[in-house]
A protein has these predicted regions:
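Hinge/beta->alpha junction and helix N-cap segments in small-molecule ligand-binding domains
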Residues: 72, 90-99, 117-125, 175-185, ...
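N-terminal helix-turn-helix DNA-binding module of bacterial transcription factors
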Residues: 1-80
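Alpha-helical recognition/docking segments in bacterial nutrient-uptake
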Residues: 1-20, 83-188, 192, 252, ...
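Flexible loop/turn connectors
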Residues: 228, 249-356
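Periplasmic-binding protein-like
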Residues: 133, 137-145, 197-201, 233, ...
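Conserved hydrophobic residues forming the short capping helix/wall of the S-adenosyl-L-methionine
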Residues: 63, 108, 220-221, 251, ...
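Short beta-strand segments enriched in small/hydrophobic residues
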Residues: 36-41, 77-91, 197-204
Length: 356
């Protein structure tokens, strides 16, 4: 029989491992000489200003001696209220997502546990994989760059907020980045530098945000009179090595076509281009101007530093968490959808130092 009073089963400290026993909050309370409510406050990190230092120390010593572990999921099931929030995101080795997570935690960490569900880099979240997580009965979901199909399958099951999915159904609470304006700013910058032929290195992915970046770049190129031939659009995985290989393959034809500027779907693509350019002895930016997206931390310290579209990932995470908190409290987020502005940070990969 399983009672959810906030404890997990462990082996007894008596040495009799044949009969595991549940260490409960009541046992900790008796050991420390305090109430179970006091144990709950200390164990859940809510004792500040509510429990005396002496009692807190006694509870912590009892927890350590007895091996008490809070069973958050069990407690949530018993109360009918979950304390688990799941963030579904691509490859978290990308520093962009570290900033998103920091923003989410700044809002939810005091009351919720954040669980990460990681998809393959640049791949839209899978509804079938996410359904497995729903078995944990989370309070809500934060989903980065889902497809419309994902929203149709998962969207009605529990509170959910979408991040960075421009163009996706407007009925879901969302926080988007103005990536279209960012792409236009890149093209405007190229035009101001006198470039008339450009190429674009896209990401092999089904995510809407990257499709919007590409289409906005191509549209703006036409508006500014910059030619982008169909053969001047290539793609690779969001990976430095893959991007380097893709650029190396296409550069001979791009050079022959007179390409002098290259837009990249992400800064990871731009890193790959710079790596290949050194091998191929291409001078950046004298022979080829290169701009990226996301303004990752290393973009400012690469050689040359990368011109990039800056997206406020931490603020995006914070706003998404605020919208989810509103949903969890039974309120409608205001506004339902938010758009964060982007900004172009100009560096040495597109202009020679002193010409900015």
């Amino acid at each position: 029989m399983c009672d959810y009073d906030g404890a997990m089963t462990i082996a007894e400290k008596t040495g009799n491992h044949r009969e595991p026993r549940r260490v409960t909050a009541a046992m900790v309370a008796a050991h420390a000489g305090v109430s179970t409510a006091t144990v709950s406050l200390v164990a859940n990190g809510k004792s500040s200003g509510r429990v005396s230092a002496k009692n807190e120390q006694r509870v912590r010593e009892a927890i350590r001696e007895l091996g008490y572990i809070v069973d958050s999921i069990g407690s949530s099931l018993a109360k009918g209220v979950s304390s688990l929030v799941v963030l579904v995101a691509p490859d978290i080795s990308n520093p962009f997502f570290a900033k998103v997570i920091a923003g989410v935690r700044s809002v939810l960490a005091s009351d919720y546990q954040l669980m990460l569900s990681v998809t393959d880099a640049g791949v839209s979240p899978s509804a079938s994989e996410t359904r497995k997580i729903l078995g944990l009965r989370p309070a809500g979901l934060l989903v980065h760059a889902p497809s419309q199909e994902f929203l149709e399958e998962i969207g009605g099951n529990l509170p959910m907020v979408v991040l960075d999915a421009p163009g996706i159904s407007a009925k879901f609470p969302a926080v988007n980045m103005d990536v279209a304006q960012g792409a236009r700013d890149v093209v405007a910058h190229f035009a101001a530098q006198g470039h008339t032929r450009a190429a674009y290195l896209d990401a092999i992915t089904g995510t809407e945000t990257l499709a919007v970046r590409r289409e906005a770049f191509l549209q703006a190129a036409g508006d500014f009179g910059i030619e982008v031939l169909p053969s001047s659009v290539a793609s690779s995985m969001i990976d430095v090595t893959a991007a380097s290989a893709a650029f190396s393959e296409h550069w001979p034809s791009w050079k022959k076509a007179g390409v002098t500027a290259l837009g990249c779907a992400t800064d990871n693509h731009a890193f790959g281009v710079l790596h290949a350019a050194r091998t191929l002895q291409i001078r950046i930016p004298q022979q080829l101007a290169v701009a990226g997206f996301d303004d990752l931390p290393y973009s400012a310290t690469s050689n040359p530093a990368i011109t990039s579209v800056q997206l406020n990932a931490q603020e995006g995470g914070r706003l998404a968490a605020l919208k989810l908190r509103s949903l969890l409290e039974g309120k409608s987020p205001e506004p339902l959808q938010s758009m964060l502005p982007s900004s172009l940070v100009v560096r040495g990969s597109t202009v020679i130092d002193g010409d900015r």
